[in-house]
Design a protein with these regions (language model features):
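Signal-peptide-cleavage-adjacent N-terminal segments of secreted and extracellular proteins
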Residues: 2-79, 112, 136-140, 144, ...
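N-terminal cap/lid subdomain of alpha/beta-hydrolase-fold enzymes
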Residues: 5, 66-155, 166
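Short, functional N-terminal and low-complexity linear motifs
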Residues: 30-32, 125-128, 158-162
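Phosphate/oxyanion-binding active-site loops and adjacent basic polyanion-contact surfaces
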Residues: 57-61, 146-158, 183-186
Length: 186
């Protein structure tokens, strides 16, 4: 019950912070995170971005994200945050590459092909590698890997979302959904 109350509090804080003004222009930070093309990627009609967001400078903790925008009307589509379960399963290696992402990896591992069931046809998908130590997310403090838990993971995710929304303010007023599987629901 306490965990649920804390999560509701964090979500209310996040909603309050996201109620400030937004801009539709691509920022310098966004441009730096733009993926022009992945190795072996087919031609696509949507934009992709990836990068790191620092969630704790003192410990050197940063979370990795990959945003795949919708190929049709991305400015009118909602934002969906995807979290894999586990805990400890990579959202990029599994959720994006094996389930709902725009690409599949061919059997030889030499190229990508389009996933005809990709969820980014209906929403802009934000894949988050969480907690630090999972996938491409990292910490420079080894003890963080031993002391990670639900509360710190939730706090880091909130810090990530607040900072990410500052980097991508055009998503502040969109419908926002959180989806995942297994332990991601915790």
């Amino acid at each position: 019950m306490m965990r649920m109350a804390a999560m509701l509090f964090y979500m209310m804080v996040f909603a309050t912070i996201c109620s400030s003004s937004s801009s539709m222009a691509i920022t310098r930070e966004q441009e730096e995170d733009r993926i022009r093309e992945l190795p072996g990627q087919p031609r696509v009609g949507f934009s992709q971005f990836s990068g790191y967001v620092s969630v704790n400078k003192k410990h050197g903790r940063a979370l990795f994200y990959w945003l795949t925008q919708s190929p049709s009307s991305p400015n009118n589509k909602p934002l969906l945050l995807w979290l894999n379960g586990g805990p400890g399963c990579s959202s990029v290696a599994y959720g994006a590459s094996e389930e709902i992402g725009p690409f599949r990896i061919n059997k030889t591992g030499s190229s990508l092909y389009l996933n005809r069931f990709a969820w980014n046809t209906e929403a802009n998908i934000l894949f988050l590698e969480s907690p630090a130590g999972v996938g491409f997310s990292y910490t420079n403090t080894s003890s963080d890997l031993l002391t990670s838990g639900d509360n710190r993971t939730a706090q880091d995710a909130l810090i990530f979302l607040v900072k990410w929304m500052s980097r991508f303010p055009q998503y502040k007023y969109r419908d926002f959904y959180i989806a995942g599987e297994s332990y991601a629901g915790t």
